[in-house]
Amino acid sequence: MFYQNSQRRIYYDDQLQKHTQFNNEYIYAFTWEDPRVDHRLLKIREDDVVLCITSAGDNVLDYIYQASPRRVHAVDLNPNQNHLLELKTAALQSLPYAQVWKMFGEGRFPGFRDALISKLSPHLSSQACQYWMSHTSTFDSSHGLYETGGSR
C-alpha cells in the first residue's frame, strides 16, 4: 500500500497536451548550471521566497541547503522534472547516505524498486510514485540515471 505523508506539490492535469508533449520523459537528469553564481548574485536569505525552474532539482536543493530560504517554489512545464526532484527529496528524507549516493552519485541502484515501495513512496505524490514505478529500470540499467533523459 502506498500513501503520501505530506503534500509538497499542487495538483496538475497530467493529460493536458502541454504536459504530455514530453512523452513521459524528463529532459535533464542533472543540472548543468552552477548555483554558486546564483548565490553570489541573488544573495538568498532565510526570509526570502524563491521561485525557480526545477530542471533536475539540483539547484533547488542547493538553494535550500545553502541559504535556507523561507520557501522555494520550483516549477517546470515538464512534470517529469518535478517527479525527479520529488524522488531526490524523498531519498534524502528516507534513505541512508550510501543508498542516496548509489542513486544520485553513481546513478545506479539495483534495489531501487524495493526502496521505492518500502521507503520512498510515503514521500512522493501519487503521480510521482506512479511515474517511478513505471521507470524502475532507470536505476537498474547498465547505463544508469545519467544516461537517461532527453539531454543525453
Spans of features found by a protein language model:
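N-terminal, positively charged/glycine-rich alpha-helical extensions of SAM-dependent methyltransferases
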Residues: M1-T20
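Alpha-helix initiation/capping motif
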Residues: R8-R9, D34, A56, P96, ...
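Conserved alpha-helix/loop element of class I SAM-dependent methyltransferases that forms part
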Residues: E25-V49, D58-D62
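Conserved beta-strand positions in the Rossmann-like core of class I SAM-dependent methyltransferases
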Residues: L51, H73
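Short beta->alpha hinge that forms the Motif I/post-I loop of the SAM-binding pocket
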Residues: S55, L77
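A short acidic (Asp/Glu
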Residues: V60-Q66, H83-K88
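Conserved S-adenosyl-L-methionine
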Residues: Y65-R71, P79
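Class I S-adenosyl-L-methionine-dependent methyltransferase module
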Residues: N80-R152
